[in-house]
Amino acid sequence: MALDWDFMFHSIPAFFKGLELTLYISFFGILLSLLVGFLCAIVLYFKTRFISPIVYIYGEIARNTPLLIQLFFLYYGLNEIGLSALECAILALGFLGGGYMSQSFLLGFKSLASIQRESALSLGFSPLKMMYYIVLPQSLSVSMPSIGANVIFLLKETSVVGAIALTDIMFVAKDFIGIYYKTTESLLMLSLTYLIALLPLSVLFVILERSFKKKVA
């Protein structure tokens, strides 16, 4: 079966419009997940009393429930709050990602030898200064591959936000399939659009990983 190249060409603006929304949700959702994950990792790393169990439970819930359910819970279950679909998508992505990012950061923190932490504390470093000057710079070289994988995973997870009527690239593809019955062309354009977004990210994280390793070496 021959591809309808004319249809694919004329669908480019719609897919790029959907990509714009996908990247917007991904940017703020991933930013939120990095912040939440980092703070949770610090709590787990220092084994903060009372708070650590709560953070642990949050992480288990975030990682073991699908993003779609989290979206529905925010958009339909808590509709009295009045959050928009876009806000729900960003918050749900941040909630899901925070659970994964916390483990990525924690992996890096735990990679440091205990003697480094003990030496820093004996030299009068506060836990905050120790984290900033010693733990964070060295741990990022270990955490970066996992963080990069999580970022790519979260961007791909945005494919479900169309369930709450957000016109991301997956929504655009489904719309074209339903209206024009161009299944192969629509899915091919969808795949190409994701590749345009994800391949530069993959390269970026490889560069960042090498950069952090050189700084630590």
Identify what each model region corresponds to:
Residues 1-217:
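Transmembrane alpha-helices and adjacent helix-loop boundaries
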